[in-house]
Amino acid sequence: MKLHELKAAEGANKASKRVGRGTGSGLGKTSGKGQNGQNSRSGGGVRPGFEGGQMPLYRRLPKRGFKNIFAKEYAAINLDRLNCFEDGTVVTPELLVEKRVVKKVKDGVKILGNGNIEKKLTVKAAKFSKSAIEKIEAAGGKVEVI
């Protein structure tokens, strides 16, 4: 077989539906839209959520909650992700972004205690979980809240 002899697999290339090209095509006259009515018209159809005049679900249900504009969003990292650093490294949020451990710092970094840490690191972050502090100090490292 040569490159110029390559062919698509049987049934791989399907002709597009050409509607409104005569009754013999099977998709002529009404072009697969049924008889007359709102849905057969150009731009026809109802908006999303419309229930035929019945009070729609999104208006039947009560409003609930609010978005706290003062809420702080932290980039969370588990301890086992910090094993990529060498012994004695000072781990800062900027270094975490540089090494692509975290995409964005947001309002700070929070270190969580999932996994184990084998390296002696000085970790600087906005927040730490209790278990993370215990594990970092047990490995001989230091914790600094910034």
Curated annotation (Swiss-Prot):
<feature type="compositionally biased region" description="Gly residues">
    <location>
        <begin position="42"/>
        <end position="52"/>
    </location>
</feature>
<feature type="compositionally biased region" description="Gly residues">
    <location>
        <begin position="21"/>
        <end position="35"/>
    </location>
</feature>
<keyword id="KW-0694">RNA-binding</keyword>
<dbReference type="InterPro" id="IPR021131">
    <property type="entry name" value="Ribosomal_uL15/eL18"/>
</dbReference>
<comment type="similarity">
    <text>Belongs to the universal ribosomal protein uL15 family.</text>
</comment>
<comment type="subunit">
    <text>Part of the 50S ribosomal subunit.</text>
</comment>
<dbReference type="GO" id="GO:0022625">
    <property type="term" value="C:cytosolic large ribosomal subunit"/>
</dbReference>
<dbReference type="GO" id="GO:0003735">
    <property type="term" value="F:structural constituent of ribosome"/>
</dbReference>
<keyword id="KW-0689">Ribosomal protein</keyword>
<dbReference type="Pfam" id="PF00828">
    <property type="entry name" value="Ribosomal_L27A"/>
</dbReference>
<dbReference type="InterPro" id="IPR001196">
    <property type="entry name" value="Ribosomal_uL15_CS"/>
</dbReference>
<dbReference type="GO" id="GO:0019843">
    <property type="term" value="F:rRNA binding"/>
</dbReference>
<dbReference type="InterPro" id="IPR036227">
    <property type="entry name" value="Ribosomal_uL15/eL18_sf"/>
</dbReference>
<dbReference type="InterPro" id="IPR030878">
    <property type="entry name" value="Ribosomal_uL15"/>
</dbReference>
<feature type="region of interest" description="Disordered">
    <location>
        <begin position="1"/>
        <end position="56"/>
    </location>
</feature>
<protein>
    <recommendedName>
        <fullName>Large ribosomal subunit protein uL15</fullName>
    </recommendedName>
</protein>
<keyword id="KW-0699">rRNA-binding</keyword>
<dbReference type="InterPro" id="IPR005749">
    <property type="entry name" value="Ribosomal_uL15_bac-type"/>
</dbReference>
<keyword id="KW-0687">Ribonucleoprotein</keyword>
<comment type="function">
    <text>Binds to the 23S rRNA.</text>
</comment>
<dbReference type="GO" id="GO:0006412">
    <property type="term" value="P:translation"/>
</dbReference>
